[in-house]
Amino acid sequence: GVAINALSGGVDSSVVTVLGHRSLGDRLKTVFIDNALMRKGEPERVVKILAKMRIPVQLIDARAEFLGALRGLTDPEEKRHAITHTFYSKVFGRLVRETDATFLLHGTILTDIEETVAGIKRQHNILAQVGIDPEKEYGYKVLEPLQTLRKDGVRKVAKILGLPPEIAKRIPFPGPALATRVVGEVTEDRLEVVREATDIVEKELGKSKAFQYLAVLLNDKATGIRE
């Protein structure tokens, strides 16, 4: 059968993409869905990196659909649900129908499953754990080749596969992307602010040994420190 997977540029989805293409070849169609929520220049950059590895990636412009789904929403869980629904039911569901794909390769890792089951947070990429039958709901089966690995294990696989350090060592980035770093309503203008701030923070702290660093756009003024 034909399989499809969505590349986000993170180490998990990138490893799945390389493994999938080496196993399935032309039977795997890889897409990068630009949801308007990514880092600065990320869609084009990721497509170029995979092209150097001779892996074709189709760039899908779905920015208007995602921004429309998020309009007026301020609750974090409602925003996460809107992104999940738009991704799986609308954009990805449409692509699956167009390609006649019967399988979805997904970069779910062990930590995603544990956090969802424990109720720590709802992971956007966990379907069965949140009561969704993808075959019944969307028409495809989900394959999760990384579900027994944690992030450090995935990074080791990435290095073995020859993925560049900018992907293999990339700091964790949430599935709903910059939408999780905008407090309150997610608009195009507010996304642009946090996108520029994220770019600055990551460039300045990129050589540090910190596990995570990020920028958040608040809804109001916050306490500051003056020299």
Question: What would you call each of these model-derived segments?
Answer:
Residues 1-227:
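ATP/NTP-dependent adenylation/nucleotidyl-transfer catalytic domains that generate, transfer
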